[in-house]
Amino acid sequence: MKSGRRGGQNWAPSRQAPASAESDVALRHVRRAEELFRRKAKEPLTLAEAAACAGCSVRALQLAFRRCRGMTPMAALRRMRLEAARAGLADGPTSIRAIAAAYRFTNPGRFARLFKEVFGQSPSELRQAQDRTTG
């Protein structure tokens, strides 16, 4: 009877890719999804759409983002949208509510809370600081 082990090791060929190859593939998936996020930051996006664009399954994209960015794909999209909204706040007089809505934040209070968590100041505090430096 064969045991499937030879010399204490499994002799069957490994089905896992080397770690560096897995990392390269994961990073490629992440970068494709991030490019989609940048192009369509103001449009509704689903995780399934991001995975299709990246050329992988939803689960593979989730794992790739966790490995490469330390966050979920949707958290990365939210972060990109917040960064774009921050740039929009710096660009001119458009209302905070309009900028938030443009980047798919439909609840102004939640937008302000997330913004402050990420940037350390609320959108209105950012505006006030800009007014002091430019005015």
Model-derived segments and their meaning:
Residues 2-35, 39, 53, 67-72, ...:
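Short, Lys/Arg-enriched, Trp-marked, Pro/Gly-tolerant hinge/linker segments that flank
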Residues 11-14, 47-76, 100-122:
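Basic/polar phosphate-binding segments, predominantly the helix-turn-helix DNA-binding elements
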Residues 31, 35, 39, 44-49, ...:
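Terminal helix-turn-helix DNA-binding modules in bacterial transcription factors
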Residues 125:
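Short beta-strand "wing" residues that participate in macromolecule-binding interfaces
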